[in-house]
């Protein structure tokens, strides 16, 4: 048994004992974290136990097959089962991002292309909301800056799973590869001559930070309030309900005006701020994380793209893995599993190849 696997089995047993202690529920946050980790370890521990049983059965079947050829078919079947279980278990032994099982904050920002880009940002928002609905996730618009024609200049959404997610199946684990610049090729509604235009929107996916992940000193914050504005900049509220929070040590600025209550806007802004500060702290500490985040959107430019949505050809193309499919309408309606699975599989294969 490999050392990492032995460690997983020991950790699983230890957590099981700790969760059986009634005192653990005096600390709900810690209990939730242990429950999440216990669920993460359940599958690899089960695979290891099944593999151990199959290997024992295989050894016995081989001994019998030496005396009785009728056992050879059983040997072949057990060898296939052994190979399958070993391959599935190995995937769990590859180092994974601990954030994969977290919830996420997703931001969509219009870029090059003016109003058409804002409309495309709205299409992307709807795509992710529909995908979340298909997955049974909960969503909450934290902040939105609508455009004149019903699109969005920028919008932030909290996406939360229901219950404990399996490894890699959490909101962030599923959406992490959506980060980057998305490009659209189509005839805009504002185009009278019927010419195809290219526009872009940027997507940023952040693991949502819990209070225990990062402490924010209130003295490090400057909080400004102002009146909410709608399309065209007109005021839509007679009270100062919108909130802008500036984290003075880093210069990170977050504003929220989507809710009618100043308190709700402040809470939403703090959620986004914590997520951004957590991501920034991990970037600084981990070179690998910095490289991964560098592939996400910095400036929304048409030249740096991860995916193209081509309306005339009904085609979606993910340029990172050469993925192509002619089901654009379905994808924009939230049918994202195929491309996400392809990206996840490519990432797993890359990490497995790099694992000794």
Curated annotation (Swiss-Prot):
InterPro entries: PCRF (IPR005139), Pep_chain_release_fac_I (IPR000352), Pep_chain_release_fac_I_sf (IPR045853), Prokaryotic/Mito_RF (IPR050057), RF-1 (IPR004373)
UniProt keyword annotation of Transmembrane present: no
Modified residues (N5-methylglutamine): 234
Post-translational modification note: Methylated by PrmC. Methylation increases the termination efficiency of RF1.
GO cellular component, one term: cytoplasm
Gene3D superfamilies: 3.30.160.20, 3.30.70.1660, 6.10.140.1950
Keyword line: Cytoplasm, Methylation, Protein biosynthesis
Compartments in which it is found: Cytoplasm
Principal subcellular localization: cytoplasm
GO molecular function terms noted in the UniProt entry: translation release factor activity, codon specific
A family per Pfam: PCRF
Superkingdom of origin: Bacteria
Function: Peptide chain release factor 1 directs the termination of translation in response to the peptide chain termination codons UAG and UAA.
Family per record: Belongs to the prokaryotic/mitochondrial release factor family.
Stated name of the protein: Peptide chain release factor 1
Organism: Parafrankia sp. (strain EAN1pec)
């Amino acid at each position: 048994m490999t050392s990492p696997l032995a460690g997983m089995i020991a950790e699983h047993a230890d957590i099981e004992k700790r969760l059986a202690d009634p005192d653990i529920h005096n600390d709900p946050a810690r209990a939730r974290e242990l429950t999440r980790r216990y669920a993460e370890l359940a599958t690899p521990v089960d695979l290891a136990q099944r593999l151990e049983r199959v290997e024992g059965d295989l050894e016995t079947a081989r001994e019998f097959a030496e005396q009785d050829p009728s056992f050879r078919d059983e040997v072949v079947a057990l060898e296939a089962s052994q190979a399958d279980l070993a391959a599935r278990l190995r995937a769990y032994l590859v180092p994974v991002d601990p954030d994969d099982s977290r919830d996420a904050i997703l931001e969509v920002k219009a870029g090059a292309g003016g109003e058409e880009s804002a409309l495309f940002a709205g299409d992307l928002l709807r795509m992710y909301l529909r995908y979340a609905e298909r997955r049974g996730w909960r969503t909450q618009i934290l902040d939105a800056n609508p455009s004149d024609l019903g699109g969005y200049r920028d919008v932030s959404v909290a996406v939360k799973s229901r219950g404990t997610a399996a490894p890699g199946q959490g909101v962030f684990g599923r959406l992490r590869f959506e980060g980057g610049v998305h490009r659209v090729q189509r005839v805009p509604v504002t185009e009278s001559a019927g010419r195809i235009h290219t526009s872009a929107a940027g997507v940023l996916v952040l693991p949502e930070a819990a209070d225990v992940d990062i402490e924010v000193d209130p003295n490090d914050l400057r909080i400004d309030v102002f009146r909410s504005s709608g399309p065209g900049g007109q005021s839509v509220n007679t009270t100062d309900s919108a909130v802008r929070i500036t984290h003075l040590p880093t210069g990170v600025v977050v504003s929220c005006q989507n809710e009618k209550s100043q308190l709700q806007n402040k809470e939403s802004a703090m959620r986004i701020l914590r997520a951004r500060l957590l991501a920034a702290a991990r970037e600084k500490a981990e070179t690998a994380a910095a490289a991964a985040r560098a592939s996400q959107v910095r400036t929304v430019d048409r030249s740096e793209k991860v995916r193209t949505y081509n309306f005339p050809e009904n085609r979606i193309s993910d340029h990172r893995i050469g993925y192509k499919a002619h089901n654009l309408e379905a994808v924009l309606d939230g049918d994202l599993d195929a491309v996400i699975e392809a990206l996840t599989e490519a990432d797993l294969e890359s990490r497995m190849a790099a694992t000794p």
